[in-house]
C-alpha cells in the first residue's frame, strides 16, 4: 500500500509540475518529491526523472532539480553493487578516524534510504515483486526479501505500540531524533550500536540537501519514525539471536563479528522466504478489505494501547519538552521511558543494553552534541514549547489516521484555526523555529554554514510572514467631511427644498463647464445637465456639496419660479439682481411693469439683451438701453407683420396650377372586383355607362352592312382610348358595357387587357431607376 500510494502521489506531483509554472509551487512540489520513498520501479513507470530534469536550467528551482536528479541516479548503482558495498563497508569503517563517524553515519543513512525505498516500500502485488526480482542480482534477492519483511514487522509493531499519529508532541519531535534502520546486516549492527547516540543527540548525521527534506518528511510521518525509534528494541526482541548478540558486543568489536552475522543471516534465508510468502498473502488479504475497516481497526488498537502507555509517554514528552538536548542524564531517562514502552509491547525487559551502550559513546560525538546544545541554549526555555506547537500547526494537522492511509492523501482536509498574530510576532516565532531546525540538522562544520542557511530560510519566510497582513488591507476611501454647521431653528412656515436632482445645476459661481452644450444648458433653470441622455446609465449622483445659506436657497427658489414673480414690494434691486439676471426680456419687462421702481436700475440688464439680440445697433442720443431694446423690438415686429401680410397676399393671388380632384366625378366609377367579374360574366354592365359615351351617333340605321361593321369596329377600338383619357380606368372592366351599348356582348370574344396608367407609370419609373445603375 505504501508503494502504491507513493506512486499515486508521484503521479499527482508530476502532473502539477507540468501544469503549474509558478516557481514557489514548483519548489514546493520538488520538495515533496524529494521526501517521498522513490524506487526504481516508480521512476521507470512514471518517468518523473525526465520531468524533474527538464527544470535543471530553471532560474529558481534549477539547483534543487539537479540535486534531486543526482540523488535519484544513485538508486540504481546502490542496488546493484549492494553486496560489494556490504563487504567493503566494515573495512572502511575500521579505517576511518573517530571524527569521521558522522560522515559514516550519513552514508549509512543514505544507503538505508535508498535500499528501504527499493525493498521496504515495494508494491504488494506479485507482478511488481517479479519485476523487482528481475532487476536485482540473484545473490541479493533473499537478502532484500528478508529485510523487507523485517521492515514490515517493525511497521506493524510501531502501529501497535504507538497510537496512529499520536497527538503527543513527542511523536512529531521523535521524527527528528530517529534515523532510519540500516539496509544490510552489518549496517543494522552498526546502527544498533549507535542507537544510543541517536537517542542522545537528534540528527547527529548531517544529510545532504535532499536528506534535509527527508527529515521534514519524517516530521509529517511521525508514526513510522516513532515506531522505528521505539522499535529498535523490538527488532532485537523479534530476532533475539541477532539483536541480543549485537547489543552486548562493544563498538570496537565490529570487524570480528561480521562473519558470524553473515553466517546467521544465510542460515535464516529460507525461513525468511517462507515468512515473506505468508506476510504477502496477509497483506493482499488486507488490501482486499475496505480501507475504512482497516483504519477503524488500527484506530481501535491505537486507542487501547494509548490508554495503557499514556503515563510513560507523558513522562517522556515532559522530559523532552522541558529540556530537549540539554543534559545527558535527562536523555538517559527518556531512553529508559522508551525502553519501558518496548517492554510493554513485547513482554520482555530489554532496556539494559541501551544505557550500557550509551556509556561507550565516542568523545567526538559528545563534543558535537555540546555544540548543538549551546545553539539550543540560546533560546529561552519558555518559548520552546510555543515554538514546537507552532511548528506542529504549520507542518501538519493533528494526525488521526494510520501511516499508509495518511500517505494516500484521501482524507478530507480540515481547516486549521490559526490565531491571528501580528507579523512581527509571527516572524519572531518562525525565526526561533528556524534556529531550532537548523541547529538540529547541521554536521561538524555547522557553525560555518548556519549564517548562509539562515539567510536562505529568511527569504522563504518573507512571503509567509506577509500573508497574515493581507486580510487587514481595507480599502481606505476618503469620505468628504461634512462641515460642522449648526442646524437652523425650525420655522412654522416650512417648505421643503425641491428634489436633489436639480441641485447640481444650480450651484452658484460654476465656471468650469466640460462643453459649450453643457454651458448652454446650465443657463436654463430646472434642467438636468444630462437631460439629452436618453440611455439609462445609473442613477445620477445628486447631493449638496455644502450646506446652502438661507439667502442662496431663496434665490434658487426664485430663479426656478420667475414666471410667478409679480410685485416684489420694497425688496431692493441688489437682492433681486441674481434673479433678474436670469430673466428673459419678456419676463424682465413684465416684472418692471409691475414694479416701476426697478426701471431705473435695470439698464445694465437691458444692455446685455441688446448686445445679444441686436449686436450691430447702438443707442441714439439720450436713449437708454431699455428704450433702445423696446424700439428695435417694435421695429422687428412691424417688419415681421409686413412680411406675413405680403406672403399671404402672394399666395392668395397666385394662379392655381394642378388641382386635386375627386377620382370619379366625371367618369365611370370603378366597381368592386367581384362585381366587375359578375358583370363580365353575365353582361350586366350597361347600366353603368355614363352619358358622355352616348353622345356618339349609332351607325346602324344608315349605310350598307359593311359600313356598320366598320363603324362599329372603329368605335369599338376608339372607345377605349377615349375612356383612357377621360377617367382613371385601370382595367378593361368597362369595355364590356361600352360594347354592349353598341353591339351585343359576345362572350366568345376575349376582352383586350390594358395596363393601368398608374401601374404603367410605376413600372416605367422602376425601369429608369434600375437602368441608371
From Swiss-Prot:
Modified residues (Phosphoserine): 195, 310, 380, 383, 515
Residues annotated with N6-acetyllysine modification: 430
Biological processes, Gene Ontology terms: regulation of transcription by RNA polymerase II; transcription elongation by RNA polymerase II; transcription initiation at RNA polymerase II promoter
Record flagged with keyword Nucleus: yes
Sequence ranges of Polar residues compositional bias: 112-124, 728-744
Record domain TFIIS N-terminal: where: 4-79
A GO term, aspect molecular function: double-stranded DNA binding
Major localization listed first in the record, in broad terms: nucleus
Ranges for region Disordered: 79-480, 671-747
Activation domain: annotated span: 521-680
BC-box: annotated span: 549-558
Subunit structure: Heterotrimer of an A (ELOA, ELOA2 or ELOA3P), ELOB and ELOC subunit. Part of a multisubunit ubiquitin ligase complex consisting of elongin BC complex (ELOB and ELOC), elongin A/ELOA, RBX1 and CUL5. Interacts with ERCC6; the interaction is induced by DNA damaging agents or inhibitors of RNA polymerase II elongation. Interacts (via BC-box) with CUL5.
Domain notes: The BC-box, which mediates binding to the elongin BC complex, has the consensus sequence [APST]-L-x(3)-C-x(3)-[AILV].
Protein name, UniProt field: Elongin-A
Source organism of the structure: Rattus norvegicus
Source taxonomy: Eukaryota, Metazoa, Chordata, Craniata, Vertebrata
Amino acid at each position: 500500500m505504501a508503494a502504491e500510494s507513493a506512486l499515486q502521489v508521484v503521479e499527482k506531483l508530476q502532473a502539477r509540475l507540468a501544469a503549474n509554472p509558478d516557481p514557489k509551487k514548483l519548489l514546493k512540489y520538488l520538495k515533496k518529491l524529494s521526501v517521498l520513498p522513490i524506487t526504481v520501479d516508480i521512476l521507470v513507470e512514471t518517468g518523473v526523472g525526465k520531468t524533474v530534469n527538464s527544470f535543471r536550467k530553471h532560474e529558481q528551482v534549477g539547483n534543487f532539480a539537479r540535486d534531486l536528479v543526482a540523488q535519484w541516479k544513485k538508486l540504481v548503482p546502490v542496488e546493484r553493487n549492494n553486496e560489494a558495498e556490504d563487504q567493503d563497508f566494515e573495512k572502511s569503517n575500521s579505517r576511518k578516524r573517530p571524527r569521521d563517524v558522522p560522515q559514516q553515519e550519513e552514508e549509512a543513512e543514505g544507503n538505508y534510504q535508498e535500499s528501504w525505498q527499493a525493498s521496504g516500500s515495494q508494491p504488494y502485488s506479485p507482478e511488481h515483486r517479479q519485476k523487482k526480482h528481475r532487476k536485482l542480482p540473484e545473490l541479493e534477492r533473499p537478502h532484500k526479501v528478508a529485510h523487507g519483511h523485517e521492515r514490515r514487522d517493525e511497521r506493524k509493531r510501531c502501529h501497535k505500540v504507538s497510537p496512529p499519529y499520536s497527538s503527543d508532541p513527542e511523536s512529531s519531535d521523535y521524527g527528528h531524533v530517529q534515523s532510519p534502520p540500516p539496509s544490510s546486516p552489518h549496517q543494522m549492527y552498526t546502527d544498533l550500536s549507535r542507537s544510543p547516540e541517536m537517542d542522545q543527540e537528534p540528527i547527529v548525521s548531517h544529510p545532504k540537501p535532499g536528506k534535509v527534506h527527508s527529515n521534514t518528511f519524517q516530521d509529517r510521518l511521525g508514526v513510522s519514525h516513532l515506531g522505528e525509534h521505539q522499535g529498535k528494541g523490538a527488532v532485537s526482541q523479534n530476532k533475539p539471536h541477532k539483536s541480543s548478540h549485537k547489543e552486548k558486543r562493544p563498538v570496537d568489536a565490529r570487524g570480528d563479528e561480521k562473519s558470524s552475522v553473515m553466517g546467521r543471516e544465510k542460515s535464516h534465508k529460507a525461513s525468511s522466504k517462507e515468512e515473506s510468502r505468508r506476510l504477502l498473502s496477509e497483506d493482499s488479504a488486507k488490501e482486499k478489505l475496505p480501507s475504512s475497516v482497516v483504519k477503524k481497526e488500527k484506530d481501535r488498537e491505537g486507542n487501547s494501547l494509548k490508554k495503557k502507555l499514556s503515563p510513560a509517554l507523558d513522562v517522556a514528552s515532559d522530559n523532552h519538552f522541558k529540556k530537549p538536548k540539554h543534559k545527558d542524564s535527562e536523555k538517559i531517562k527518556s531512553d529508559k521511558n522508551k525502553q519501558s514502552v518496548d517492554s510493554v509491547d513485547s513482554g520482555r525487559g530489554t532496556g539494559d543494553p541501551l544505557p550500557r551502550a550509551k556509556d561507550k559513546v565516542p568523545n567526538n560525538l559528545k563534543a558535537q552534541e555540546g555544540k548543538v546544545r549551546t545553539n539550543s541554549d540560546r533560546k529561552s526555555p519558555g518559548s520552546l514549547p510555543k515554538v514546537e506547537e507552532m511548528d506542529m500547526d504549520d507542518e501538519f494537522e493533528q494526525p488521526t489516521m494510520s501511516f499508509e492511509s495518511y500517505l494516500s492523501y484521501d482524507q478530507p482536509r480540515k481547516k486549521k484555526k490559526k490565531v491571528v498574530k501580528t507579523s512581527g510576532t509571527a516572524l519572531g516565532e518562525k525565526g526561533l523555529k528556524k534556529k531550532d531546525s537548523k541547529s538540529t540538522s547541521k554536521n561538524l562544520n555547522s557553525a560555518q554554514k548556519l549564517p548562509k542557511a539562515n539567510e536562505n530560510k529568511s527569504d522563504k519566510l518573507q512571503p509567509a510572514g506577509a500573508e497574515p497582513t493581507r486580510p487587514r488591507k481595507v480599502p481606505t476611501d476618503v469620505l468628504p467631511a461634512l462641515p460642522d454647521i449648526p442646524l437652523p431653528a425650525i420655522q412654522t412656515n416650512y417648505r421643503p427644498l425641491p428634489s436633489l436632482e436639480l441641485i447640481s445645476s444650480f450651484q452658484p459661481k460654476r465656471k468650469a463647464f466640460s462643453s459649450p452644450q453643457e454651458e448652454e444648458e446650465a443657463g436654463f433653470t430646472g434642467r438636468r445637465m444630462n437631460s439629452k441622455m436618453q440611455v439609462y446609465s445609473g442613477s445620477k449622483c445628486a447631493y449638496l456639496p455644502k450646506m446652502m445659506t438661507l439667502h442662496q436657497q431663496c434665490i434658487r427658489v426664485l430663479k426656478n419660479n420667475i414666471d410667478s414673480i409679480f410685485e416684489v414690494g420694497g425688496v431692493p434691486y441688489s437682492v433681486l439682481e441674481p434673479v433678474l439676471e436670469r430673466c428673459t426680456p419678456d419676463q424682465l419687462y413684465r416684472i418692471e411693469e409691475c414694479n416701476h421702481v426697478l426701471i431705473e436700475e435695470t439698464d445694465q440688464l437691458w444692455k446685455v439683451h441688446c448686445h445679444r439680440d441686436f449686436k450691430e445697433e447702438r443707442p441714439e442720443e439720450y436713449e437708454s438701453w431699455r428704450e433702445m431694446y423696446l424700439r428695435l423690438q417694435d421695429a422687428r415686429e412691424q417688419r415681421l407683420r409686413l412680411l406675413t401680410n405680403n406672403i399671404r397676399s402672394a399666395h392668395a393671388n397666385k394662379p392655381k396650377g394642378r388641382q386635386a380632384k375627386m377620382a370619379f366625378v366625371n367618369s365611370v366609377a370603378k366597381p368592386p372586383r367581384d362585381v366587375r367579374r359578375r358583370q363580365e360574366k353575365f353582361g350586366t354592365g350597361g347600366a353603368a355607362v355614363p352619358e358622355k359615351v352616348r353622345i356618339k351617333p349609332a351607325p346602324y340605321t344608315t349605310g350598307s352592312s359593311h359600313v356598320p361593321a366598320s363603324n362599329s369596329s372603329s368605335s369599338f377600338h376608339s372607345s377605349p382610348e377615349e375612356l383612357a383619357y377621360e377617367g382613371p380606368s385601370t382595367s378593361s372592366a368597362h369595355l364590356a358595357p361600352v360594347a354592349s351599348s353598341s353591339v351585343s356582348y359576345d362572350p366568345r370574344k376575349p376582352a383586350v387587357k390594358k395596363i393601368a396608367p398608374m401601374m404603367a407609370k410605376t413600372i416605367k419609373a422602376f425601369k429608369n431607376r434600375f437602368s441608371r445603375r
